[in-house]
Structures are given as C-alpha cells and as structure tokens.
C-alpha cells in the first residue's frame, strides 16, 4: 500500500517544519516547499528523515507561476497528495498613511491569499476526480479581530477564513475536505519579533500535534489553542 503524501508550503521553519515532522511520524511521504531549500534538506537530515520519503520543491508562494509550477512538479514526481497544507505566509506591520506600506499590503495579500489559492490550484482537479483529499488553510486568530498596526496581516487572515469557507462549500460535493486552522501565538522566528505579550504561547510541535488531530478528523475550523478562540470571540464582542 502506498504511503499517503502531504504537500506543505513554508517548510523551512516554524509551523511548517513542525507539521512536516508530525506528518512524517504518522507515516506520510512529504512534499516540502520553501525558498530556502538547503535549510529544509539540513533539517530533514537532522531529524533522520530518509531521502526516499521526501522531495523538496523550490518556490516563492508570492509568485503565482512559481508555486503552481511546484505543485505540478509534485504531481509529476510524487503523485497526487492526500493532504495539501497552505502554510506559507508573511506578517509585516503597516501604516496606511505611509505610501510604501500600500506595497506591503499588496505583498501580504499576494503571499497569504493568492499564494494559498495558487497552492491548492494544481491539486483540485485530481482531488475532485478522485473524490478524496484534504486542503488545509492556515489562518490566524488575527483574522477574527483586527489589531492596530497590523491591518494588512489581519485583513489577509480574515480573507483566508472566508476563502476557505467558500472553498469548503465548493469541494464538499466531490468528497474533498477543506480545513481551516487558526493558530494563536506560536513560538516561531516570526513571532519572536513581536514586542508585546503573547498569551497562551505554544511550541510549534504542540501546535502540530493538535493540528494533525484536526486535519485527521476533518474539522472544518479549529482555533489552536482553544483558549485563544475564546479570547478572540470576547475581543470581537467588544466595541471597536
């Protein structure tokens, strides 16, 4: 029996690496996408992942043709994935009064939103024909309540949640599942730049364990950790 295959973007650090390790531990072959491919190879070797159980694809998720080409390359080299995780994303603060920050917003949406759709794109025809598969979008609790100074990131993650809701309805008749995961604060190189308190901070592998459960159960939507879901809902209820 062929081992299942997981296609994961943003695999060079943080959540992406933690998810890759968790899926490897569950017996999946890996298709790992990153710009820094040498780092992915070193990480795989350090974690004892055999070269025969993974492939690395160089791509920039912000460039549509680049990530689409990586997906098509995966289809040719490893076949149709069972799980596709659109994890790659960026978070940059912005000031609407600053002209240059309009470009920051465009780059954020190109990566976090168009990049997600482009990640899924090559695999949708095969999954709908096969009538199975799981598409996973990584959102954020920041998509539930906007944070001052982070308009681009918060808006992009709110769009992720809505996009995955739409896609879920489109894919359901074909037996393809769409899972939205909204992390709270995870200890990654990205969040270590934050200069404010991060309640319920999780280690990446703890997040990956809970994320794997949610994906395996085909949850439509899950906030991880659940406490941040409560916090986000309370904040959402407050006057803006």
Which residues make up each language-model segment?
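Conserved glycine-rich Rossmann-like NAD(P)H-binding loop of the short-chain dehydrogenase/reductase
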Residues: 26-43
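Active-site helix of classical SDR
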Residues: 120, 156
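C-terminal helical subdomain
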Residues: 180, 196-232
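Rossmann-fold cofactor-recognition segment
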Residues: 47-65
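Conserved mid-core segment of classical short-chain dehydrogenase/reductases
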Residues: 91-106, 149
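Conserved glycine-rich cofactor-binding loop
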Residues: 12-13
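Residue(s) in the substrate-gating loop at a strand-loop-helix junction
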Residues: 140
């Amino acid at each position: 029996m062929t081992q299942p295959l997981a296609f994961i973007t943003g695999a060079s650090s943080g959540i992406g690496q933690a998810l890759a390790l968790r899926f490897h531990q569950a017996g999946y072959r890996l298709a790992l996408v990153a710009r820094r491919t040498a780092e992915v190879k070193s990480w795989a070797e350090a974690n004892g992942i055999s070269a025969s159980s993974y492939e690395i694809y160089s791509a920039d998720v912000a460039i549509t043709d680049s990530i689409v080409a990586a997906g098509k390359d995966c289809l040719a080299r490893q076949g149709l994935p069972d799980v596709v995780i659109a994890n790659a994303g960026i978070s940059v603060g912005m000031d609407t009064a600053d002209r240059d920050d309009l470009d920051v917003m465009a780059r954020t949406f190109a990566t976090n939103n168009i990049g997600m759709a482009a990640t899924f794109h090559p695999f949708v025809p095969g999954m709908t024909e096969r009538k199975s598969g799981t598409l996973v979008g990584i959102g954020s609790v920041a998509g539930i309540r906007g944070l001052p100074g982070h308009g681009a990131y918060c808006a992009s993650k709110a769009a992720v949640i809505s996009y995955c809701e739409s896609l879920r309805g489109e894919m359901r008749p074909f037996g393809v599942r769409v899972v939205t995961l909204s992390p709270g604060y995870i200890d990654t190189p990205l969040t270590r730049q934050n200069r404010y308190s991060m309640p319920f901070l999780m280690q990446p592998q703890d997040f990956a364990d809970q994320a794997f459960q949610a994906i395996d159960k085909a949850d439509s939507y899950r906030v991880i950790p659940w406490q941040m879901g409560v916090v986000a809902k309370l904040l959402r209820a407050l006057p803006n």
